[in-house]
Amino acid sequence: MTKRSEAKYKIDRRMGQNIWGRPKSPVNRREYGPGQHGQRRKGKLSDFGVQLRAKQKLKGYYANISERQFHSIYVEATRLKGDSGENLIGLLERRLDTVVYRAKFVSTMFAARQFINHGHVKVNGKRVNIASYKVKVGDLVEVKESSKQLTFVLEANQLAERDVPDFIEVDHGKMTAKFIRIPHLSDVPFAVQMEPHLIVEFYSR
């Protein structure tokens, strides 16, 4: 397992859940945390602990977004009309790295961030190298022509472990993805239960 994979799966081990639904996740082989004390039964979490865990899990899922960036997204979510938890998910799904991952241009959220940072992605015909770029409804995201034959891109396109959600329209031949609509929590294909309402409670303390 590579160092990057080890770092990625550390989130799974810490949460005790296979948060991306990956076949190679170490939690598929055990149901306890890492380390020599991993098999000890954990005590019941306080309300604060449950809320904190929900936040850590969602942050981890989106490639371990920094606390500063995640809180900024949360603040924006509270300023939008409607349910703040739903708004939070909608904003996270509008991130360019999330769209690239959902479209199956790469195999992981972490790879999506690196792929964008290295200049392999265009939005509406213009190169964008900022992973947190906010995609709008109707935007066309595409893999740069010279990057379409990269081995890891071709392999990701064939992954059977996840499907493209219906709020993104993908042309696998052209490697383009059109962002159709902002999704609700129920539209997002999370491998484990996410509870954004607990995150709203956490920040509202």
UniProtKB/Swiss-Prot annotation:
PROSITE patterns: RIBOSOMAL_S4, S4. Disulfide bonds: none annotated. CDD domains: S4. One of its GO terms (molecular function) is structural constituent of ribosome. InterPro entries: Ribosomal_uS4, Ribosomal_uS4_bac-type, Ribosomal_uS4_CS, Ribosomal_uS4_N, S4_RNA-bd, S4_RNA-bd_sf. GO terms for cellular component: small ribosomal subunit. Signal peptide: none annotated. This is Small ribosomal subunit protein uS4.
